[in-house]
Curated annotation (Swiss-Prot):
Keywords: DNA recombination, DNA-binding, Transposable element, Transposition
NCBIfam families, sorted: transpos_IS5_3 (NF033580)
Residue span of region Disordered: 51-71
Provenance organism: Burkholderia cepacia (Pseudomonas cepacia)
MF terms (GO), sorted A to Z: DNA binding; transposase activity
Function: Involved in the transposition of the insertion sequence.
Annotated protein name in UniProt: Putative transposase for insertion sequence element IS402
Family the UniProt entry places it in: Belongs to the transposase 11 family.
GO biological process, one term: DNA transposition
Amino acid sequence: MRLGRDMLAPAARLASSRCLGSLARATARKAARSGPDRLLTSRRRFIIDSRRWGRPKTGPNPTDRARPGSKHHIVTDANGTPLAAILTGANVNDVTQLLPLIDAIPPIRGLRGHPLQRPRVVYADRGYDSERHRRALRDRGIEPVIAKRRTEHGSGLGKYRWVVERTHAWLHHFRRLRIRFERRADIHGAFLKLGCCLICWNTLRRADQSL
């Protein structure tokens, strides 16, 4: 999937009238009509990750204490389709956004008679390692697959996490997300969600072309 780097600039006026939730629901409904091998089959496995970038919504950047920064937290399905995105300061611990990301996933129609609103499995890296949050996910009927902090690399989680890494790369093809120009967090957060909407739209467009 290739996304134009400057698509957000002409689309900026849409930020006030578009949101990730409504487009994700429409995408899933269209995919459900396209066949069983489309987006809905991937809602059983979700992957969570975050990336740090400059300017506020801000806290000290952990990688450069002299500069403020912000962080993009996203959750995707197993195909890399973004389902929810949250903007925080760069010094916010990843694990604090685990449950808010799960709660932000928009409800969409599942298979007939078996609506699926929550994932069955969530994959995440060491930044989300917390027994309290594992218990909270299990209480919701979600199986957490989260790397522990002291485990070596190569544990096998990477075969799932590369999907969300790719989605971060797609988002940062957009210059306004790769380089933060906005001082106001709400404006940058709107661009983040608009970027997710464009990825959803591009995914659906390519799925239609393959039919």
